Amino acid sequence: MVKIISSENFDSFIASGLVLVDFFAEWCGPCRMLTPILENLAAELPHVTIGKINIDENSKPAETYEVSSIPTLILFKDGNEVARVVGLKDKEFLTNLINKHA
């Protein structure tokens, strides 16, 4: 299951393990297309935690990580950014990215 993140719990959410965060906005078409892909990944890859943060409602993490385009996906390992991709990516691409850092 993909979890919804807020500015308040962002740091604790990414603090440990492998975590993929989707920076999105409700009005973003590619962001909406990414949602079912992330839901599938969450079900198939139990070694990664997946979360989404709405940048319109929670701007601080987007500013901190200099997110200027959406969707932006950032992969964190124990709180540190290890990979970043911008734009709509398919399931195979994201699976390979996650497994590369597992």
Curated annotation (Swiss-Prot):
The keyword Mitochondrion does not apply. GO terms for molecular function: protein-disulfide reductase activity. It holds the Pfam family Thioredoxin. CDD domains: TRX_family. Participates in various redox reactions through the reversible oxidation of its active center dithiol to a disulfide and catalyzes dithiol-disulfide exchange reactions. Belongs to the thioredoxin family. This is Thioredoxin. The gene is trxA.
